């Protein structure tokens, strides 16, 4: 048998660094939401407070995961009463108050932008949006805003003392705290 030569251009370029967005183990999907300038400013401020090992691209994934865990805790609290959330929560503002979150300022329409989420977080965002839309009539952008505010609170209270953390460590920390 003859040996194949490894002199092809593909073989030569295999180890060359790629341009563009860095590759991830699981490819991310674009999800479109409307963000106001204030919400974009919150994201920019969060980037500076993230532990080493996390990057800006991890913020949407972690925010959606935190929201889905918090909604799951609410659902488990009323599991014996055939409800999704407790009786006292009648609108989105009461959910903000339950979680001690600042109410979002209504400063007009946001501009549509894409966020990149892992496939599991896209499913969780859809599930959270479905529940909150059925209960309160909210849209995907409002659900993402709620998740951003939740993650900002989590960053201030539970993640501020961590200097380094990977994405998996923060997901485990969220699960350990709330579940």
Tell what function each PLM region has.
Residues 23, 32-37, 42-72:
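N-terminal accessory/assembly segment that mediates macromolecular interactions
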Residues 53-81, 136-166:
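Short, basic amphipathic alpha-helical segments that act as recognition/interaction helices
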Residues 2-40, 47-48, 85-123, 129, ...:
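Short Lys/Arg-rich basic patches
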